[in-house]
UniProtKB/Swiss-Prot annotation:
This is Cytochrome c oxidase subunit 2. It comes from Dromaius novaehollandiae (Emu). Cu cation A1 binds at residues 128, 163, 167, 174. Cu cation A2 binds at residues 163, 165, 167, 171. It catalyses: 4 Fe(II)-[cytochrome c] + O2 + 8 H(+)(in) = 4 Fe(III)-[cytochrome c] + 2 H2O + 4 H(+)(out). The gene is MT-CO2. The lineage of its organism: Eukaryota, Metazoa, Chordata, Craniata, Vertebrata. CDD domains: CcO_II_C.
């Protein structure tokens, strides 16, 4: 709409149908200011509604709580009774051959693929940020506040991330590993972990 108006006025000016009095007039300046403002408002209102609707998952298949600490993550599967664990980076001296240095953890976050997952994120001490770029997720972890994000994995695989908020001396030693598996594998994993934590 704006481009069409500009081209129309440019054509009128080139054909000399607009006099210098019209071009320099306050009415034209007022139109040049108000019309783009109205167009921007008409674009912004639906965009904001869509932005908020995209962030909400009404009924996720799984809710996961991630708590940032200096310098590890705690995960709680809130849909299960006793399913929680701490996830620390595997030191380079203990890293198995073929694994990524500074990215591998002792306990991965396992999620079922093709299921909407809600992650509730907070921190226990200082600011952190739960970021997994390949899933398009980055959410700040703030002490005393619950932030949420969501994602759906469409294929099995391992997705790596990091704390992306400088949180102290060992900030770069807070990797995040999300493992996406078929639902049956996830159910087997969760029942094994629940059984071992209840011992």
């Amino acid at each position: 709409a704006i481009c069409s108006l500009v081209l129309y006025l440019l054509t009128l000016m080139l054909m000399e149908k607009l006099s210098s009095n019209t071009v320099d007039a306050q009415e034209v300046e007022l139109i040049w200011t108000i019309l783009p403002a109205i167009v921007l408002i008409l674009l912004a209102l639906p965009s904001l509604q869509i932005l908020y609707m995209m962030d909400e998952i009404d009924e996720p298949d799984l809710t996961l709580k991630a708590i940032g600490h200096q310098w590890y993550w705690t995960y709680e599967y809130t849909d299960f009774k006793d399913l929680s664990f701490d996830s620390y980076m595997v030191p380079t001296s203990e890293l198995p051959s073929g694994h990524f240095r500074l990215l591998e953890v002792d306990h991965r976050v396992v999620v079922p693929m093709e299921s909407p997952i809600r992650v509730i994120i907070t921190a226990g001490d200082v600011l952190h940020s739960w970021a997994v770029p390949t899933l398009g997720v980055k959410t700040d972890a703030i002490p005393g506040r619950l932030n949420q994000t969501s994602f759906i994995t469409t294929r099995p695989g391992i997705f790596y991330g990091q704390c992306s908020e400088i949180c102290g001396a060992n900030h770069s030693y807070m990797p995040i590993v999300v493992e996406s598996t078929p639902l049956t594998h996830f159910e087997n994993w969760s029942s094994l972990l629940s059984a071992s934590s209840s011992l």
